[in-house]
């Protein structure tokens, strides 16, 4: 049984991957209390002792405001931590999966969807951190994959962490009768975290390289929120009361474009459900709709 170490293993993605694949692999799902990735000696010592076959590096600080307010801390985790893990992987001969982000393109003036070969122009600190790691990994490792995730969504599961995501947040807001603000000028892929986990395991059989990873979606965030409310059976008048079109941050002149082109991944046999289909399937799987 091959051993997988997952940093960020207590998080939204990591906890589900560990739960899904613990019968096929020996999985060490590590949280920040288990391993401080900013401590180079600790990272090297742990990985040398465990001798994993794979390391999935999912630890990171994605919160935009935190990254702005604490840029040194964010860089220590998002950049230094990733490079320490990569060096340890090289030392022990482990294959590394580095989880990157769609936010590499939030500063691009070109229209998406973006391909892996397109020039990344990150605006946010998190995207800049991820790009720096992507650029430095080839100097450290040969055997690695970079996966650029879309935005993940999912529902609560026993023993797993729930993260901020469009599906669960929309359902909660509807239940609590709270207004939901969303822009018609924000475009990004949105993927079921469990479908991500299924396909992430398949990635381990693919050639090394960089892959855009997740569901294709051409609808705005506003349209997706409306779709979710319709799917869970809210009446039209209730949807109109709850859903507020908010274009204060993004507009026709300032569109947020984060869509990724997944043609390369599809050519290797990994195909995600489109976002709306993935949302429908998730709601059906959890018994929320029939």
List where the protein language model places each region:
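Adenosine-cofactor binding site in Rossmann-like domains, unifying the SAM/SAH pocket
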Residues: 26-45
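Mid/C-terminal beta-alpha module of Rossmann-like enzyme folds, strongest
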Residues: 197-250, 290
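Catalytic helix-loop patch of NAD(P)-dependent Rossmann-fold dehydrogenases
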Residues: 76, 80-84, 104-147, 153, ...
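Conserved C-terminal active-site "lid" loop/helix of NAD(P)H-dependent oxidoreductases
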Residues: 220-226, 243-281, 286-290
């Amino acid at each position: 049984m091959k051993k997988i170490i997952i940093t960020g293993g207590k998080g939204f993605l990591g906890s589900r991957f560990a739960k899904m694949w613990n019968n096929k692999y020996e999985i060490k799902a590590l949280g920040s209390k288990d391993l401080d990735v900013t401590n180079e000696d600790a990272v090297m010592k742990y990985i040398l002792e465990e001798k994993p076959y794979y390391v999935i590096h999912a630890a990171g600080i994605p919160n935009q405001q935190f990254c702005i307010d604490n840029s040194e801390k964010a860089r220590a985790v998002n950049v230094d931590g990733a490079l320490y893990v990569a060096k340890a992987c090289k030392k022990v001969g482990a294959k590394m999966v580095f989880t990157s982000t769609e936010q590499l393109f939030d500063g691009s003036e070109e229209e998406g969807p973006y391909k892996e070969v397109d020039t990344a122009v990150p605006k946010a600190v998190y995207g800049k951190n991820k790009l720096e790691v992507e650029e430095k990994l080839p100097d450290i490792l040969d055997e690695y994959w970079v996966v650029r995730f879309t935005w993940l969504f999912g529902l609560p599961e026993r023993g797993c962490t729930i993260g901020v995501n469009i599906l669960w947040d929309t359902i909660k807001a509807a239940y609590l009768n709270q207004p939901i603000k969303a822009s018609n000028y924000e475009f990004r892929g949105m993927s079921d975290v469990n479908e991500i986990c299924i396909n992430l395991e398949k990635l381990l059989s693919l050639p090394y390289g960089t892959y855009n990873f997740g569901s294709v979606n051409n609808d705005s965030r506003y349209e997706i929120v409306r779709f979710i409310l319709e799917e869970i059976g809210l009446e039209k008048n209730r949807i109109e009361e709850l859903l507020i079109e908010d274009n204060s941050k993004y507009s026709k002149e300032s569109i947020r474009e984060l869509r990724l082109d997944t043609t390369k991944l599809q050519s290797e046999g990994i195909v995600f459900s489109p976002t709306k289909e993935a949302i429908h399937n998730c709601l059906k799987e959890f018994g929320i709709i029939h």
